[in-house]
């Protein structure tokens, strides 16, 4: 396991590459932002939105997928304030929404938008979450489908071809899908987690009826092509600055958590549902890094902390089994602690963790694994 010389990302991060100086592509992407002609990018954005803007006001200008989080709150506010767009906000609601998530959703609506909320069948959602956990190591799998598929379905149903997303996570965090346009190819590769391993249509093998999977399937190619559905990343046309945007949305009433989220030291991200901490924990066991590493890298890029300070934060906050909803999590998915450990063992990269003399993964008194490699 090797680590970037500039930030803290390891070479186990999917899609990450290193140059000959040992600097990762995420760091290089961030530095490249300073070389981009953002005025030219802005003009390109204007050309795109003018192509799709409703001329007679009879329809919405675009769809903005939202969660009530800091990014989608900023997206909606920005395109309305700066360009006079009339967006339709679309939210795929996770089954395990928490009060703070609902509070931020209501705050977003109060800013002044038309808003559609899609609530999936909670019984089917739970089954899909259990499949995601046991087969893919991702309990938030159905959400990662629905947040892409439902806005695309609404776009087709309401005949609104332009969908405006926020940052391109593949570009922002050093992945391979760095284009400006979110098209079907990008969606199939990056926008439906594990579609290559588990196409949603194959979930019927687990006893779920195909008609119950409609929210998690994209419109047909013909429907998408006929309407000309086009998804773009706002972050491809405007310099993305998380901290400036956070300041703006807090001024609009966005609320952060009163304490850091489990697995990190920050309190401003992934505030809407219960099990994101578990998602981040499984990321850690698979790749040897989690949400604290993500946040530390961002802080390093923006010169808010040094690499050494980031190392200490990661060591303090990362790699522990989430406890806030753990008992509820086990009960929800009908698991014993032993069964949970078995799932962890199934998806953990055993080469990254300490083992006992019998070759099994070593656990401390709280059941936590011990990572062998550190930046």
Which ranges hold each PLM region?
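Nucleotide-activated chemistry modules centered on ATP-dependent adenylation/adenylyltransferase
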Residues: 1-62, 78-375
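Short, glycine-rich nucleotide/cofactor-binding loops
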Residues: 62-72
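Long, structured ligand/cofactor-binding scaffold of large enzymes
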Residues: 74-76
């Amino acid at each position: 396991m090797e680590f970037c010389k500039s930030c803290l990302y390891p070479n186990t991060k999917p899609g990450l590459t290193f140059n000959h100086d040992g600097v990762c592509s995420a760091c290089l992407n961030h530095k490249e932002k300073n070389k981009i002609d953002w005025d030219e990018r802005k003009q390109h954005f204007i050309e795109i939105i003018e192509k799709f803007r409703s001329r007679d006001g009879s329809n919405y200008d675009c769809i903005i997928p939202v969660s009530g989080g800091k990014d989608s709150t900023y997206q909606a506010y920005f395109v309305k304030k700066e360009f006079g767009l009339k967006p339709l906000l679309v939210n795929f609601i996770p089954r395990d929404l928490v009060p703070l998530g609902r509070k931020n959703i209501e705050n977003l609506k109060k800013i002044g938008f038309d808003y559609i909320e899609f609530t999936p069948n909670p019984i089917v959602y739970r089954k899909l979450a259990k499949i995601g956990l046991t087969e893919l190591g991702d309990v938030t799998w159905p959400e990662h489908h629905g947040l892409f598929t439902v806005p695309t379905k609404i776009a087709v149903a309401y005949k609104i071809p332009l969908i405006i997303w926020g940052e391109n996570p593949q570009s922002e965090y050093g992945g391979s899908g760095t284009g400006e346009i979110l098209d079907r190819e990008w969606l199939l590769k990056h926008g439906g987690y594990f579609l290559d391993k588990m196409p949603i249509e194959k979930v019927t093998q687990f006893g779920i009826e195909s008609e119950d999977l409609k929210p998690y399937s994209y419109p047909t190619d013909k429907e998408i092509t006929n309407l000309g559905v086009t998804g773009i990343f706002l972050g491809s046309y405007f310099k993305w600055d998380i901290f400036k945007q956070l300041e703006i949305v807090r001024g609009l009433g966005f609320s952060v958590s009163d304490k850091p989220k489990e697995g990190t030291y920050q309190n401003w991200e992934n505030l809407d549902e219960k099990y994101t901490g578990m998602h981040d924990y499984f990321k850690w066991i698979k790749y040897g890094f989690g949400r604290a590493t993500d946040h530390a890298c961002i802080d390093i890029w923006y010169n808010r902390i040094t690499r050494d300070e980031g190392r200490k934060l990661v060591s303090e906050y990362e790699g522990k089994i989430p406890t806030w909803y753990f008992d509820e999590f086990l009960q929800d998915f009908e698991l014993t602690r032993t069964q949970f450990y078995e799932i962890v063992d199934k998806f953990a990269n055993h080469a990254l963790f300490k083992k006992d003399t019998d070759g099994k993964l070593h656990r401390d008194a709280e059941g936590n694994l011990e990572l062998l490699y550190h930046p």
